[in-house]
């Protein structure tokens, strides 16, 4: 399973990319707005394009960039503009009627599409049939309403395997490291997570205790 970072912060991307384990990045309008607010920079079309280009050059893998339009025609136009920024851009569309229409057209043009805001296996099936390269079920948000995000992911992964659909599953809305383990065990192709969760994957108190003990023992006997 590949690991993606769900952020638009170049600083966070550079930090995790240095670990050598980062395969891609997912963004959305909220994350982009936060990144520009943190920089104190105006969010112009030119600045946005330059920012996305910098992300693509840093990570070297797929970077999902989401449209803000709601109608298919406008989604297609915006998707084309996003795809033109860098070859690694994947156009992110909402799983709606208009999103499906736009997905069909963009994918027919050779533009990769990530269908997002998926909360059912049927939505994932529709997205795959519309030509999506990726589908993104939201584990955390499903858990939030007392449903089972893991069960949703299991259904989608199994359905795609049974139907032999050429689409990758991105486990999204990851809230904690257990979600990552669950996604890997259930067969997700990718898990995308916030910077804080990515950092937590590495943390374990016994690792810190063990390292401290090794160093203390070495100090006692070193020449």
UniProtKB/Swiss-Prot annotation:
Q: What is its main location?
A: cytoplasm
Q: Name one GO biological process term.
A: carbohydrate metabolic process
Source organism superkingdom:
Bacteria
UniProt subcellular location? Cytoplasm
Q: Does this entry carry the keyword Transferase?
A: yes
Family from the record = Belongs to the transaldolase family. Type 3B subfamily.
UniProt entry keywords in alphabetical sequence: Cytoplasm, Pentose shunt, Schiff base, Transferase
GO cellular component terms given for this protein: cytoplasm
Q: What is the lineage of its organism?
A: Bacteria, Thermotogati, Deinococcota, Deinococci, Thermales
| Pathway named in the protein's UniProt entry | Carbohydrate degradation; pentose phosphate pathway; D-glyceraldehyde 3-phosphate and beta-D-fructose 6-phosphate from D-ribose 5-phosphate and D-xylulose 5-phosphate (non-oxidative stage): step 2/3
Catalyzed chemical reaction(s): D-sedoheptulose 7-phosphate + D-glyceraldehyde 3-phosphate = D-erythrose 4-phosphate + beta-D-fructose 6-phosphate
Q: Which GO terms describe its molecular function?
A: aldehyde-lyase activity; transaldolase activity
Show the Pfam families listed in the entry: TAL_FSA
Please give the function described in this protein's UniProt entry: Transaldolase is important for the balance of metabolites in the pentose-phosphate pathway.
Instruction: Report the protein name in the record.
Output: Probable transaldolase
**Residues in the active site?**
92 (schiff-base intermediate with substrate)
Q: What EC number(s) has UniProt assigned to this enzyme?
A: 2.2.1.2
């Amino acid at each position: 399973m590949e690991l993606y970072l769900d952020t638009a912060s170049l600083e966070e991307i550079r930090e995790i990319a240095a670990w050598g384990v980062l395969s891609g990045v997912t963004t959305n309008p909220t994350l982009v707005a936060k990144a520009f607010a943190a920089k104190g920079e105006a969010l112009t079309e030119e600045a946005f394009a330059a920012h996305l280009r910098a992300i693509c050059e840093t990570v070297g893998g797929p970077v999902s960039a989401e449209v803000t339009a709601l109608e298919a025609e406008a989604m297609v136009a915006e998707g084309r503009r996003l795809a033109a920024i860098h070859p690694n851009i994947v156009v992110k569309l909402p799983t709606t009627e208009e999103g499906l229409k736009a997905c069909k057209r963009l994918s027919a043009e050779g533009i990769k599409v990530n269908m997002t805001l998926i909360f059912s296996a049927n939505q994932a099936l529709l997205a795959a049939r519309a030509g999506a390269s990726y589908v993104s079920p939201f584990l955390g948000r499903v858990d939030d309403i007392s449903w089972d995000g893991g069960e949703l992911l299991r259904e989608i992964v199994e359905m795609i395997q049974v139907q032999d659909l050429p689409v990758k599953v991105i486990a999204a809305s990851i809230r904690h490291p257990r979600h990552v383990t669950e996604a890997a065990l259930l067969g997700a192709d990718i898990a995308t997570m916030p910077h804080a969760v990515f950092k937590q994957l590495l943390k374990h108190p016994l690792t810190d205790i063990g390292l401290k003990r090794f160093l203390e023992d070495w100090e006692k006997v070193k020449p």
